[in-house]
Each structure stands twice: as structure tokens, then as C-alpha cells.
Swiss-Prot record:
The gene is murE. It comes from Xanthomonas oryzae pv. oryzae (strain KACC10331 / KXO85). Gene3D superfamilies: Mur ligase, C-terminal domain (3.90.190.20), Mur-like, catalytic domain (3.40.1190.10), MurE/MurF, N-terminal domain (3.40.1390.10). This is UDP-N-acetylmuramoyl-L-alanyl-D-glutamate--2,6-diaminopimelate ligase. It is an enzyme of class 6 (ligase). Keywords: ATP-binding, Cell cycle, Cell division, Cell shape, Cell wall biogenesis/degradation, Cytoplasm, Ligase, Magnesium, Nucleotide-binding, Peptidoglycan synthesis. The keyword Zinc-finger does not apply. The lineage of its organism: Bacteria, Pseudomonadati, Pseudomonadota, Gammaproteobacteria, Lysobacterales. Its cofactor is Mg(2+).
Amino acid sequence: MSRSMALSQLLPDVALPHDVQVSGLVMDSRTVAPGDAFVAIAGFGAHGLGFVEQARANGATAVLFEPPAPDGLPVPVDAIAVPGLRARLGVMADQFHGRPSHAMRMVGVTGTNGKTSTVQLLAQALTLLGTPTGTLGTLGVGLYGAAVSTGFTTPLVLPTHALLAQLRDEGAQAVAMEVSSHALDQGRVDAVHFDVAVFTNLTRDHLDYHGEMAQYGAAKAKLFTRPGLKAAVVNLDDGFGRTLFASRDPVLRAIGVSSRAHADASVSAQALQLDHNGINFALNIQGEVHPVHSPLLGRFNVDNLLAVAGALWALDIAPAQIATVLGQLQPIHGRMNRLGGAHGAPLVVVDYAHTPDALEQALSSLRSHAQDRLICVFGCGGERDTGKRPQMAAIAELNADVAIVTDDNPRGEDGDAIVADILRGFARPDAAIVQRDRAAAIHQAIAMASASDIVLIAGKGHEPYQEVAGVRHAFDDAIVAAQALLPRTVLGVRP
């Protein structure tokens, strides 16, 4: 839906040299369309004022910037100085797009692991319950099942509001949204109204950005102090979650969830059983108990299901309906996806686990389902937190019977150096198999597996590429695994 608004409506307290109608607010000069206002602020490597000429060429009708301008960058005579512009962008975008987050029931999900699964499972559940639901996160934006990639877990503040408006205009009545620590720290969700905030867990990740776990946790906690928030769903099996729960605003409806019988939990899983068919447990919501039989794999998916249950309860869905819909939820692409497992082929699981905690959870969960060996294919991303590399090696060595180290988006970093960092975490490095070619590593793992083994391919999940030296090459773990499984499935024997 096309929009237009007078600049004076967006900046009523700013003296404008002349008023103009603007049809959009854009920070990227490359995506400016005729009629847009170009917002020139400091980026990570450059200032927007250096790209005014390109924005003008693309049809920008106004240029806004935050003073003072950097030394050496000319300021166009008709550019409009807006003090505190960066901090105002959320409110401006919210107003321009007609306050989209207020028109839908908004659930924000934050945490190190489980954001994507929780968002997708929640959107799936609400859709099954008859509420058209949009998603915004790692897997893209769109109504459930029709998401288109954005390239961000949480986009920048201007596109975030534009995408929420898009979801509203497409008919979404609710939105499940991933809210990363970067987004909270950088103001990407400024002026987004959330009804429910969900916390999954806090483990090591993004310390290349936050520096310390305390700062990382503080960024996550910002989601739970937002004005207008009605309910908080918090994992009480997580240490930081318990701290967050204890320090909550007393006027906030707080829903603690636990699969480990925490006393303060109002939503819990009891009598938990995992088998080759999935997960079985009794869902207890404030004393009302209903059975759940889920086809999902992995102990950590119990936590994801409980987070979904807590969010649904916060949205006033009845416990019996919640239990029924939890049993209907299907796996999310790239999250504990199953391949093989029949006709003589091993069970192969593709998962996004790319942090020490996520890898440990994936392996320990699959151990509960395994009849024989557990084979793990994993790597570590280049130009990211190097401290987690030896940690992931130690976890793979402890929890898997066979560990195969391979490439996982080396980016601009030397792949051999990444592998060397990983190998330092093995007590017996000679026992690890190194095969940097990821496709070859997947084929090797499946070739060595018996029908009673499980192969975990960890790290990339839904990603359709392998990034090497700044170039994203088409690559999909699930497709490669399916190709490797084909001879086993057809012949019923090890190739």
C-alpha cells in the first residue's frame, strides 16, 4: 500500500525550509525510490552524507541528517538538520506507517538459542488456531509459511516498521518476531509495541560485539522493560531467566515456564519421554494438565514448546487448546530436520546449532533418541567469536562418538586457521576427522553410518549458502544430505 505524508507531520518541532510530501523513509541510498526522504546518519563504516548524490539521483525529495556533520563531508544547502535524528527514527517510522504494531498482537522473542524455532512454532500454532500470523526474523518476513528473506534476524528500525506495515496490509492479525540483542542495543525496534515478550535462554554468543556476558544479558533484558508490554514469558530453567523473572515489573503479567519442575513455573512439562517418534509430556498450565504428543526431536524442543505454550496462554488461549495445537506443530526448516531413518539408511538431522550451548543441546537430545553411534559434522564461522571454537570442539568430543570438523562460512578468514582453533579444544585432536569440504564431510559422515546411527549436521540449518572470501556460494546441508542418502534409501545398504 503506497503512503505519503507531509514532512512537517513527522517533524513538527523542526523548522523546515520548505514542506514536502514524502513517500518513504530510507537510510540506504541504493534503495531510495522517487519521493522518499533520505535519512543520512552515521553507519558502521561511513556516514550517509557521503551518499546524498546517489540518493538524489534515485529520486529523494528530502535529505535529513543529524548534526554535527562529520569533518570533510559537504552538507547540501537544502539538507535538513534534525537534532537527535537517530533516536527519533522509530517514532517517525511508526507514525508514517500508521502505527502497524498497534494494529496486531505482537510477540517478541529474545534469547541466544531457540528464537527462530519459537517464533516459527508460535506462528504455526496461531495460524492453526485461526489467527493469520506473520513472522519477522532469521527465516524472513511474511505470513506464516510464505516468508521472504530480509538478511537480518531483526532489520534496521526503518525497514522494521515498513515490514510490520506490510504484514498488517497482508492481513496479519498477530506477529511473532525475533528480537536480537543487536536490535535491542541499536534501537532497531524503537517504537515497536509488544504485547508479549518471551525469553528463551542466555548462553555464550556475540561476545565479539557485546564484550562481556553482563552486557549481552543487559541488552536482552531491554525487551522486558518496554512501555505497554502486557506479559513476559520467561524460561526459569535458565539462570539469567530466573534473574529476569525476579526483577520484573510487578504490574507485568509474568509467566514462568519450566521442564525441570521449577517452583515458580505456571507452565511446565511433566512425565517427559523422548523416543524415536518424538516428545511426549504432560502439559501443566496453572494446575490444569493435558497430554502432549509432539513429532519434534530433541530435549531442547520441550523448552521451545513451553515457550510457545506460555505465549499462547499470555494471548488468552485455553490450556486444552494449547495442548492440542502443540501436538500438531511440525518441525521448522533447518531446526532438527529429519532425513533418512528408514530402509537401511541412518537418521540424519540438520540443525542450525552454531553456538556451544546449542551444539551441546542438539547432541545430548539426539543421544536420547540414538540406538547406536552419534556422528557430528560441525565447524565454526569465520570473522566471529573465536573463543567458542575450542568450546564447541570439547562439546563434540564429549557428546558424539565421531566428530568431523569442516567449514561453516569461513567468510574472509583462513579456513585452516579456523580448524586449528577448533582442534585446540579436543583432548585427542588426532581422533577428530578434518574434511574442510563441507559436502565431502556430509557424504563421509553418512557413508560411515550404520542404519542404527544418527548423523547430526550442525551449524547452517536453513542457510542456502556457504560464504567464502565474501562470496556466497549456493549450498544447502539438507540437499547435500538427501543426495548422500539416496543410494542408502534406494538400495537399503551402505554404499
